[in-house]
UniProtKB/Swiss-Prot annotation:
UniProt-recorded name of the protein: Argininosuccinate lyase
Gene behind this protein: argH
Keyword NADP: no
Any single biological process term in GO: arginine biosynthetic process via ornithine
Disulphide connectivity of cysteines: none
């Protein structure tokens, strides 16, 4: 059933109808559209459009429809309705007859779809927050179990300084905590209802929009009708949060893909999240992680596309805004799937401590400790930096780690070096000295784990 047509003397071309219709994707707003319609029916009672008995009949029919949709959502796609609003209204009229035609009094699809989408976003943010915190918890648990797994830290993908696998896990906990904060912050701006703003100028009925907002679970009602039907900031905000969150997951995936290579060999992924080759029997490919990394691009594309769609629109509703849903639905679905998959990857990961330790002992990751040792002996840091660089060149020439160079060799570079240098060059000493807040020392890592556990509950 079309919600318009009296103005027209010709039927829509079938090609235009297919081009214009949005039911194939906005069917996902069915539950929100029905819930919003129940609230609107209550508001119509307060202004005398509906009697209490009529409202009760409408609400009962809408609730039956809601249960039917939950049981069989795909039924919606069997219809040729233009959009989800048309479908719900048509089904309602099928159930209650002419009474169903009174429900849209004082309401526009402009404020209706804005309300539906905000309700959907609120529900989806709740799911994302749960999945985000589950992944944080998985990372904290992995950190808890690997506090003694020493491995090389990298800059420029070159071995730099020793860290622990726990410290690496906690870095991603921090990123995910920021993602969580962004979602919680977005909820504050989502929590205002546009219902009752009409097409653009407000409704002609003296509806208490604050009461209406409360019935729908919103904190308040919007303050300007023109802005309310024009606003898609919440779509951009959530796409931006998703884009940033997926960058974090992509980096997480890239790190683990590298750690899982034969060349690094720091971890082994579970068979449950890997696949094989159709040709090479020995292969065990990190497909779950590669897909997380690859899906990052489609989420970035959704954000860019929505920015370009909105940038030139005049105020109030334009049909361009129908393009807000497919990208948003796909981006948030993708982010949610990737959060779940990242947690699954961690569930079966094996950290190969001996190999991590071996790699940490290579690459002169303790060179900074020698420079700090020289500074403690009174050598200016820039000079100490140069001295240690020369010592590293000599160690490389001899094929030895720094700590295996005899004292006589080290003293060729600086006479202040003494026997007390050797304990300082040990990996454990390198870790222990990083005891300032946020550092990699065992004490700091343990405190960070405890803090994260307390925050996550």
């Amino acid at each position: 059933m079309a919600l318009w047509g009296g103005r027209f003397t010709q039927a829509a071309d079938q090609r235009f109808k297919q081009f214009n219709d949005s039911l194939r994707f906005d069917y996902r707003l069915a539950e929100q559209d029905i819930v919003g319609s129940v609230a609107w029916s209550k508001a119509l009672v307060t202004v005398g459009v509906l009697t209490a008995e009529e409202q009760a009949q409408l609400e009962e029919a809408l609730n039956v429809l809601l249960e039917d949709v939950r049981a069989r959502p795909q039924q919606i796609l069997e219809s040729d309705a233009e959009d989800i609003h048309s479908w719900v209204e048509g089904k309602l009229i099928d159930k209650v007859g002419q009474l169903g035609k009174k429900l849209h009094t004082g309401r526009s699809r402009n404020d209706q779809v804005a309300t539906d989408l905000k309700l959907w976003c609120k529900d989806t943010v709740s799911e994302l927050l749960t999945a985000n915190r589950q992944l944080q918890s998985a990372l904290v648990e992995t950190a808890q179990n690997n506090q003694d797994a020493v491995m090389p830290g990298y800059t420029h993908l070159q071995r730099a300084q020793p860290v622990t696998f726990a410290h690496w896990c906690l870095a991603y906990v921090e990123m995910l905590a920021r993602d969580e904060s962004r979602l919680q912050d977005a909820l504050k701006r989502l929590d205002v209802s546009p219902l009752g703003c009409g097409a653009l100028a407000g409704t002609a009925y003296e509806i208490d929009r604050e009461q209406l907002a409360g019935w729908l679970g919103f904190a308040s009602a919007t303050r300007n009708s023109l802005d309310s039907v024009s606003d898609r900031d919440h779509v951009l905000e959530l796409l931006s949060a998703a884009a940033i969150g997926m960058v974090h997951l992509s980096r997480f995936a890239e790190d683990l893909i590298f750690f899982n290579t034969g060349e690094a060999g720091f971890v082994e992924l579970s068979d449950r999240v890997t696949s094989g080759s159709s040709l090479m029997p020995q292969k065990k490919n990190p497909d779950a992680l590669e897909l997380i990394r690859g899906k990052c691009g489609r989420v970035q594309g959704a954000l860019t596309g929505m920015m370009m769609t909105l940038k030139g629109l005049p105020l109030a509703y334009n049909k361009d805004m129908q393009e807000d849903k497919e990208g948003l639905f796909d981006a948030l679905d993708t982010w949610l799937d990737c959060l779940h998959m990242a947690a699954l990857v961690l569930d079966g990961i094996q950290v190969k401590r001996p190999r991590c330790q071996e790699a940490a002992q290579q690459g002169y990751a303790n060179a900074t400790e020698l420079a700090d040792y020289l500074v403690a002996k009174g050598v200016p840091f820039r000079e100490a930096h140069h001295i240690v660089g020369e010592a590293v060149v000599e160690a490389i020439r001899q094929g030895k780690p720094l700590e295996d160079l005899p004292l006589s060799e080290l003293q060729k570079f600086s006479q202040v070096i003494d026997e007390d240098v050797y304990p300082i060059l040990s990996l454990q000493s390198c870790l222990d000295k990083r005891a300032a807040k946020g550092g990699v020392s065992p004490q700091q890592v343990a405190q960070a784990i405890a803090f994260a556990q307390a925050r996550l509950g």
